[in-house]
């Protein structure tokens, strides 16, 4: 369960442009340690919503993360409830203690997490 919560938090922090800051969570438990949460096999699930909040798609995902020093290779397999299957491979680099950057071949630009 901690891995799933950590993964959700990771994608919220890396995928959304907002005013949230890592310091907003500094006293939260358990502490999010990306190297622990994204190592090995992780199960995830989620929904996509339109601007009015209506759920438009749902998915379950299997992730597998392998660290090599400060670099993570994260393989994702998404199974959408409409039957679509999607795969993605992220290369995530740890920049320093609090900053990460990730790229994937089907994602434009660089994801930044902190």
Description of each model-found segment:
Residues 25-41:
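N-terminal helix-cap/turn-to-beta initiation motif at the start of protein domains
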Residues 19-20:
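Family-specific signature for flavin-dependent thymidylate synthase
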Residues 2-7:
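Sec-dependent signal peptide recognition
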Residues 45, 50-114:
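Central antiparallel beta-sheet cores of small beta-barrel/beta-sandwich binding domains
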Residues 14-15:
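C-terminal motif of bacterial Sec signal peptides marking the signal peptidase cleavage site
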């Amino acid at each position: 369960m901690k891995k799933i919560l950590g993964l959700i938090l990771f994608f919220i922090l890396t995928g959304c442009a907002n005013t949230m800051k890592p310091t907003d969570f500094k006293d939260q438990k358990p502490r999010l340690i990306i190297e622990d949460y994204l190592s090995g096999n992780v199960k995830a699930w989620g929904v996509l919503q339109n601007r009015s909040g209506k759920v438009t798609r749902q998915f379950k995902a299997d992730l597998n993360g392998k660290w090599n020093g400060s670099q993570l290779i994260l393989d994702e397999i998404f199974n959408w409830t409409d039957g679509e299957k999607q795969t993605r491979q992220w290369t995530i680099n740890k920049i320093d203690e609090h900053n990460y950057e990730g790229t994937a071949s089907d994602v434009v630009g660089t994801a930044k997490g902190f």
